[in-house]
Amino acid sequence: MKNKMLALILAGGQGTRLGKLTQSIAKPAVQFGGRYRIIDFALSNCANSGIHNVGVVTQYQPLALNNHIGNGSSWGLDGINSGVSILQPYSASEGNRWFEGTSHAIYQNIDYIDSVNPEYVLILSGDHIYKMDYDDMLQSHKDNNASLTVAVLDVPLKEASRFGIMNTDANNRIVEFEEKPAQPKSTKASMGIYIFDWQRLRNMLVAAEKSKVGMSXFGKNVIPNYLESGESVYAYEFSGYWKDVGTIESLWEANMEYISPENALDSRNRQWKIYSRNLISPPNFLGANAHVEDSLVVDGCFVDGAVKHSILSTGAQVREGAEVLDSVIMSGAIIGQGAKIKRAIIGEGAIISDGVEIDGTDEVQVVGYNEVVGVATDED
């Protein structure tokens, strides 16, 4: 039986711009909003859009990501006719090859895709924060009789040179693609979300491999090839909240935006939930000295200090006399007595010793996974 659409989430990037936060884990596994990991948004969008088969393409530091995804049950993707498959580089008869780019990762997994037998493939990035109904995008793809549909977001003209820009005609058919142009002709930025007719994409990737034509990345190679070949390529305009959290500053900004009860992600919308794999934790404990204001505090936290406009992830501790302002404290991190944290991201399991001050007023500060700042005590 032919499946309608298979989603492939590209989650193998190293995320070097996130510095210490991705030294031990893949970028899509980085925590967000206290309760989630970044990849939860793409997985939840798939589940909410009625996509039952998902492949997650991994490469760099995949252990935490693989453990988080498991069998897909947290997203309802563990049924008889559904599932999540973790796709990692492997040694084949022609030799061992790491994924060389986004489209090369798809080529290396042709056998898996053929086993699902989809009519369409949906290509997603695993490191963006947003909500999207992919079924609406698929309907647009069908209505336009497109070979390829690219999701685009209207961005300010002054920022357009940071993105791949799609120039379209009056019917939203893409006539030109410009990769990070110095003088952009439009403001329709690619979101890195694509729907392809699978057989057409398959034929192109196989032909390119046989002829040794470089076809490693969608933006650099595949989209220009489709346009040059006269394929019908259309833009799908998205107007909701979307955030590329590939830098420390953008990750911090997205978390701060998420604190607001009226945040653009509409996190309390029960019609489009964001699911995650959440371990059972005890209730929060607020001590006699605790003062919590305008913050998100997740299960299992211990607070006996002051927390303002911040996020405390599962099991985080803010001890007596400590102050946390405009910061993200990830799971299991400990803020010691009298410590002061301002505009910072404190990684999972990190320890900020008693009396330490971290001030990100000029630039958001980061403490890495399990990093110790100051002299840890036996109590830590």
UniProtKB/Swiss-Prot annotation:
Keyword ATP-binding among UniProt keywords: yes
According to the UniProt entry, what is the EC number of this protein? 2.7.7.27
Q: What function does the entry list?
A: Involved in the biosynthesis of ADP-glucose, a building block required for the elongation reactions to produce glycogen. Catalyzes the reaction between ATP and alpha-D-glucose 1-phosphate (G1P) to produce pyrophosphate and ADP-Glc.
Q: Which InterPro entries would you find in this protein's record?
A: ADP-Glc_PPase, ADP_Glu_pyroP_CS, GlgC_bac, GlmU/GlgC-like_hexapep, NTP_transferase_dom, Nucleotide-diphossugar_trans, Trimer_LpxA-like_sf
Question: In Gene Ontology terms, what is one molecular function of this protein?
Answer: glucose-1-phosphate adenylyltransferase activity
What Gene3D superfamilies does the database record attribute to this sequence? Hexapeptide repeat proteins, Spore Coat Polysaccharide Biosynthesis Protein SpsA, Chain A
Pathway, per record = Glycan biosynthesis; glycogen biosynthesis
Q: Is GTP-binding set as a keyword in this record?
A: no
Subunit text: Homotetramer.
One Pfam family matching this protein: Hexapep_GlmU
Q: Output this protein's name.
A: Glucose-1-phosphate adenylyltransferase
Alphabetized, the UniProt keywords read: ATP-binding, Carbohydrate metabolism, Glycogen biosynthesis, Glycogen metabolism, Nucleotide-binding, Nucleotidyltransferase, Transferase
For this chain, the family text in UniProt reads: Belongs to the bacterial/plant glucose-1-phosphate adenylyltransferase family.
The positions annotated for binding alpha-D-glucose 1-phosphate are G164, E179, K180, S190
In the record, biological process GO terms are: glycogen biosynthetic process
Q: Which reaction does it catalyse?
A: alpha-D-glucose 1-phosphate + ATP + H(+) = ADP-alpha-D-glucose + diphosphate
Q: Which organism is it from?
A: Streptococcus pneumoniae serotype 19F (strain G54)
